[in-house]
């Protein structure tokens, strides 16, 4: 298996509302809720939105409703940009889990929850370089 991730699909309660939220963040969808799924190009990856019930059924699991132990991360080029993105999320209707602040491991980050409670960390890591396409270059 090649070492990469192609698609992350989030289970959502209201596909149209979730699409509207991500579009309010400035993202452009490539499909409509009438298709039953919404896709957003995210650099070399794709973010999908699909009904929680359908996603659970397709995955062969049960939708237990609680936090699934996954956090999505969006790395940026400066602490100022962390604060800007958290502000954009707030304006789009996100629940802010924590405003941008320094962490004990040297990163500046904040976090928000989308309408379905999916956690997004917005982070500036001074030890990682971001390419023009947003790809992370890991040290070593």
Where are these regions (language model features)?
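Short hydrophobic-acidic sequence motifs that mark active-site Asp/Glu residues
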Residues: 4, 46-48, 119
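Short, hinge-like loop/turn segments at secondary-structure boundaries
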Residues: 48-49, 65, 116
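Short, flexible, glycine-rich and Lys/Arg-enriched loop motifs at helix boundaries
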Residues: 52-64, 129-131
